[in-house]
UniProtKB/Swiss-Prot annotation:
Taxonomic lineage from the root: Eukaryota, Viridiplantae, Streptophyta, Embryophyta, Tracheophyta
Recorded family membership: Belongs to the HD-ZIP homeobox family. Class IV subfamily.
GO molecular function, one term: DNA-binding transcription factor activity, RNA polymerase II-specific
Protein's name in the database: Homeobox-leucine zipper protein ROC1
Subcellular location: Nucleus
Residues in START domain copies: 290-522
Coiled coil: 155-196
Source organism of the structure: Oryza sativa subsp. japonica
Amino acid sequence: MTPARRMPPVIGRNGVAYESPSAQLPLTQADMLDSHHLQQALQQQYFDQIPVTTTAAADSGDNMLHGRADAGGLVDEFESKSCSENVDGAGDGLSGDDQDPNQRPRKKRYHRHTQHQIQEMEAFFKECPHPDDKQRKELSRELGLEPLQVKFWFQNKRTQMKNQHERHENAQLRAENDKLRAENMRYKEALSSASCPNCGGPAALGEMSFDEHHLRVENARLRDEIDRISGIAAKHVGKPPIVSFPVLSSPLAVAAARSPLDLAGAYGVVTPGLDMFGGAGDLLRGVHPLDADKPMIVELAVAAMDELVQMAQLDEPLWSSSSEPAAALLDEEEYARMFPRGLGPKQYGLKSEASRHGAVVIMTHSNLVEILMDVNQFATVFSSIVSRASTHEVLSTGVAGNYNGALQVMSMEFQVPSPLVPTRESYFVRYCKNNSDGTWAVVDVSLDSLRPSPVQKCRRRPSGCLIQEMPNGYSKVTWVEHVEVDDSSVHNIYKPLVNSGLAFGAKRWVGTLDRQCERLASAMASNIPNGDLGVITSVEGRKSMLKLAERMVASFCGGVTASVAHQWTTLSGSGAEDVRVMTRKSVDDPGRPPGIVLNAATSFWLPVPPAAVFDFLRDETSRSEWDILSNGGAVQEMAHIANGRDHGNSVSLLRVNSANSNQSNMLILQESCTDASGSYVVYAPVDIVAMNVVLNGGDPDYVALLPSGFAILPDGPSGNAQAAVGENGSGSGGGSLLTVAFQILVDSVPTAKLSLGSVATVNSLIACTVERIKAAVCRDSNPQ
């Protein structure tokens, strides 16, 4: 008998040598010659060392190598298992071929990877979840594993992560569905208990009001948006889990819950006087941040402050020079390299807008900081840019009796004076700091993870201003505006303006601040010369009249934009020149006449520079050329207040010398203002008795106003925007974008129904005014 040759050991997992059990047994000459059995034995010994993957993702490969995998070998979340296996009792004297085929399979034991191997593969998985053959072989050599063991571990890990994400997203979608069902039940209950505001009886569903119809349309739109986002999320498996937040109530749900619960008082102080055509939007009813989130908010605000200071002070290569003076363009690649922290990469579907602008303004740094940190003052000073604002929570009031270290969670809605440009809502934290070099900085940064909204269309990266004290009560302000927005809804005629940064950029913020600082200085001036006819010299009279004009301009700006709180209805026109109208009821408001007010607005392009349009509209001698309500009568300026260096910045009191005796007691209050970003001419009829009270220093809040007017913007950056708008009211440039808006009291009874005749009359009024303005300004710009 020939002695059996000892087989070499097979190297298994973890470097352990496994000897063949049959190597200890004597073989006959026939067995030695049976190469087929010998080959099967060697193959069985080799494949016994290979791990078996048990996940669904690797069933096919597993079946080829091992037959059916054991179901108990699934890898748990915390520890990966190698399914390398040895048959128990391998040394019982029977080879694989000699075992009884009817005998029940032996219980298999599993060998776990070491903690070091798991940690190394986990770290590699974070960097590369799909290693190639070369990477797997390298990893197997480093960890003492077979390449197939590494391959199957990564297969198991990928399947595990996929299952986790699918479970999380399914739970999230189920929660959204439950909320929608509960919301639908609230709607049904609210409709079933609805009562008539006039008689108190049950309201007939067939008599749905105009506002209720729009609320239903808005609710349907929100449902479609949630379905669309859910569909997109279901396709992107493998992304990090999205933190689930409660969906904000729709306007109808808010209206239904307003009676038993004061939501406005529960969610923050909404700035009074800004919400003039409807309730606050969902964003401005944002929730308070949780206590657990406040450390993250503080950390984000500190990082944003560091970023803002650097962006305000650094030049090239971060900022490249621009054709406009004191303006700069941001290098996106350099920005991403310098500031890897913060909000992270740009979100899909959003476009970056970044700008920087500086100016010296006539105001102390302490007063500027107070305006920026007081939401009421901020909304008043920037009423042409901010349509609505609220502070949800004050996390810190500052130290040492000032705003150093103040931290506030806020939300705002930013606007352009036209119904063709949607407003931008933002939910952010505002942080104020006194830097070591003596400068003050105020920064805003969006709270993306806390924003309770399924759709985000505006994200504020670190934006704000750096304030440096100057002699004689002046301050140098450097403003940085950096946002990511979805501007797909902007009308085509306004896209060049928006893309240039003149609509929402830093230049508009600084220009508005500079003009308002001059206005405040004018209101406080006491050395007014008495030589000019009609100039109001009384300090109290000037303050009261300027305050009344300020409210008039804020009311005009807040009522002409495409805010989420406004529901515009398109009447007629073609394209951009459609006339849009909306109604509101004025009740118990001393600043507005009671009744139903109809607001109509339209925007159009003029081939005339903005400065020429501004001079034509503010000049009282040319008013009869476009003002139909003056009945062709001559207009005379009765009083005048200059409130800036530019002679176009003024408040005037006008008298219309009309043949109609019914208008003998009516005056017109008008404010005209212009800066480097745009111009306004706003006016309102006022009672002569009420104006006498104001001129004597009386309270202007009780003067009823229905402002109308014009907003004049450049049509883009072409032709040098500064020359196009004119810092001194003159200059030449490209065309103009003109918005015309009227407010008309159509019925003095707030509960009356709006008639189609009133709408048709206002539509004809605004259309006729537009045609007159086009004819007049085009004739003046092209004299024969």
